[in-house]
């Protein structure tokens, strides 16, 4: 209701702002080439968006393949990142999403979002549908990965405790307007 998801859609050019501008690296979003902007943006959504007909490894490989990475490079980076999120390559690479728990699917979604080292990571209430234990584990993991990869992350949540735990800066939205920005 406050405009969080709409803001995310404007950042990746799914919809255009009706008023004002959004800037990324001092350049208006609408002046960025749409395909390049989207290839440089990682996404982790509340509704885990893995392709059911693709294996874990195939889901993760999508963006690197579009960027022209070599197969060996994709496989090596997939191994490294799956291990970082607590999933062994040997046990998970050839599984399908339906064979994973919700928390495991979201871990795969995080790997898919960061494998190509995007400039910006958009996370739209990614943990709200998970149980409390998985949620805490993934919050801790997100914080660790953010510190390691140093990518700009826009994390949308309605949970103020989660915002305080994960954010360097917090923006509060009301009726589509930013009403406050501060550090936690």
Go through each PLM region and give its residues.
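Catalytic Walker B motif of ABC-type/P-loop ATPase nucleotide-binding domains
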Residues: 121-124
């Amino acid at each position: 209701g406050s405009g969080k998801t709409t803001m995310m859609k404007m950042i990746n050019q799914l919809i255009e702002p009706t008023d004002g501008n959004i800037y990324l690296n001092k350049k208006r979003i609408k002046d960025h080439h749409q395909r390049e902007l989207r290839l440089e943006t990682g996404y982790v959504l509340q509704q885990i968006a893995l392709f059911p007909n693709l294996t874990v490894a195939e889901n993760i490989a999508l963006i690197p393949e579009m960027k022209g990475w070599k197969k060996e490079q994709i496989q090596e980076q997939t191994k490294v990142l799956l291990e970082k999120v607590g999933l062994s390559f040997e046990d998970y690479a050839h599984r399908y999403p339906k064979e994973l728990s919700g928390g495991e699917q979201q871990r795969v979604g995080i790997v898919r979002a960061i494998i190509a080292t995007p400039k910006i990571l958009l996370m739209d209430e990614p943990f709200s549908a998970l149980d409390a234990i998985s949620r805490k584990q993934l919050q801790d993991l997100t914080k660790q990965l953010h510190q390691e990869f140093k990518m700009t992350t826009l994390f949308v949540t309605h949970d103020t405790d989660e915002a305080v735990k994960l954010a360097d800066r917090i923006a509060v939205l009301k009726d589509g307007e930013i009403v406050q920005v501060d550090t936690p």
